[in-house]
A protein has these predicted regions:
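Non-catalytic terminal and connector segments of soluble metabolic enzymes
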Residues: 2-6, 10-176
Length: 176
């Protein structure tokens, strides 16, 4: 079944077969203009899908100044704010919402350190990025941030809840 879903869809604690608990979360990921221009969007998206994360929202966006300022509002007044806005408005980007067990932490680990020179090999930034100002990807850093950012980039009707047969093989049976 496919339906529109709210940005805040979190299933709570779900026991997995090993007896530990996972939390199904949603998180925002942006493939920034450098990732789009370098034609890495598909490779980056594939890494998340290969890990078992589910795409529930995806679009190519030409970012205007207003959207950039809303996204970077926490940095308003900082010396690098204008540089952030200029970069994110310089070319289209890919915005997506990913869903999965502990998605926020998993995505942050997969993305790697903000400074590509400090990012571990095997991470997106460690493998593909060179310069901090052009580090390919933005990923929400906490649940509250994810909820806010998803609301900035996506309307509720742009997010689609659906079940995948593969979920039982990726995350196991889920207690509702």
């Amino acid at each position: 079944m496919v339906s529109a879903a709210p940005a805040a869809r979190i299933r709570g604690n779900n026991p997995n077969p090993k007896g530990t608990c996972t939390v199904t979360e949603r998180t925002l990921v942006l493939v920034k203009p450098d990732g789009v221009q370098r034609q890495l969007a598909g490779r980056i998206i594939a890494r998340f899908e290969e890990r078992g994360l589910k795409i529930v929202g995806l679009k190519l966006v030409r970012v205007d100044r207003g959207l950039a300022e809303r996204h970077y509002a926490v940095h308003k007044g900082k010396p690098f704010f204008e540089q952030l806005v200029a970069f994110i408005t310089s070319s289209p980007l890919v915005a997506m919402v990913l869903e999965g067990p502990n998605a926020i932490g998993m995505v942050r680990t997969m993305v790697g350190a903000t400074k590509p020179t400090e990012a571990a090999p095997g991470t997106i930034r460690g493998d593909l990025a060179v310069e901090m100002g052009q580090n390919l990807v933005h990923a929400s850093d906490a649940r509250e941030t994810a909820l806010t950012e998803i609301g900035i980039w996506f309307r509720p009707d742009e997010l689609v809840a659906y079940e995948r047969e593969i979920d039982r093989w990726v995350i196991g049976p889920q207690a509702e």
